C-alpha cells in the first residue's frame, strides 16, 4: 500500500514531527533509505514484512533469569504498569534512566543509547551493566564505537570494532 500526502496528513505535521524526521535522517536515515531503494521490489516487500513482524518489546527467560528486551527504554515508567500499556514513543525513543532500577526480579536490556553517552560510565563503548539494566548499544556508528553482543546464557560479552 502506497502512503500519500493529503491535505489532512499535511495538517497533522507539526514542528516536533519535522524535528524527529530530521534527526532520523541525520542519524542514518538517508543512507538507509538510499540502500532500501537500491533493492528490488520483492526484496523491499520482504524487508517491510520482516520489520512489520517486530515486537515493541519481548520478555524472555534464560537459565531462570528474566529479561525485558526493548529498543530504547521504558518512558513514563511505573512499577506496576504492564508492558503492553506503554506507548510506542516510550519504548523506541525514550532513553533509559541508567540510575534507576526498573525491576528487582528481571533485567531490562536496551539499545538506542550508545554507552559512550551514558553519564559516569566507566567503560564507554562497551556493554554497560548497572541497576538490573544492561545497555548493549556500543556505538558502532560512532568513531571509536563497536558492535557489542551479550550471550545471555553466561553473560559473556563479545565485540567487533567498527571500521572507520
Question: Language-model segments: which ranges?
Answer:
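Short, small-residue-biased leader/transition segments that mark boundaries at the very start
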Residues: 1-5
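Acidic, His/Gly-enriched loop-helix segments that form or flank divalent-metal centers
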Residues: 12-17, 22-135, 139-145, 156
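Short, basic/aromatic-enriched C-terminal tail that caps enzymatic domains
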Residues: 146-164
Amino acid at each position: 500500500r502506497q502512503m500519500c500526502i493529503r491535505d489532512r496528513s499535511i495538517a497533522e505535521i507539526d514542528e516536533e514531527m519535522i524535528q524527529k524526521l530530521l534527526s532520523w535522517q541525520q542519524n542514518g536515515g538517508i543512507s538507509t533509505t538510499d540502500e532500501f531503494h537500491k533493492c528490488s521490489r520483492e526484496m523491499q516487500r520482504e524487508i517491510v514484512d520482516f520489520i512489520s513482524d517486530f515486537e515493541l518489546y519481548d520478555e524472555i527467560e534464560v537459565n531462570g533469569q528474566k529479561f525485558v528486551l526493548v529498543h530504547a527504554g521504558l518512558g513514563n515508567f511505573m512499577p506496576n504498569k504492564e508492558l503492553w500499556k506503554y506507548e510506542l514513543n516510550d519504548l523506541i525513543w525514550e532513553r533509559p534512566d541508567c540510575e534507576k532500577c526498573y525491576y528487582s526480579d528481571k533485567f531490562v536490556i536496551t539499545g538506542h543509547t550508545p554507552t559512550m553517552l551514558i553519564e559516569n560510565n566507566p567503560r564507554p563503548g562497551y556493554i554497560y551493566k548497572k541497576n538490573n539494566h544492561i545497555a548493549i548499544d556500543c556505538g558502532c556508528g560512532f568513531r571509536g564505537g563497536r558492535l557489542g553482543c551479550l550471550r545471555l546464557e553466561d553473560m559473556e560479552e563479545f565485540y567487533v570494532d567498527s571500521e572507520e
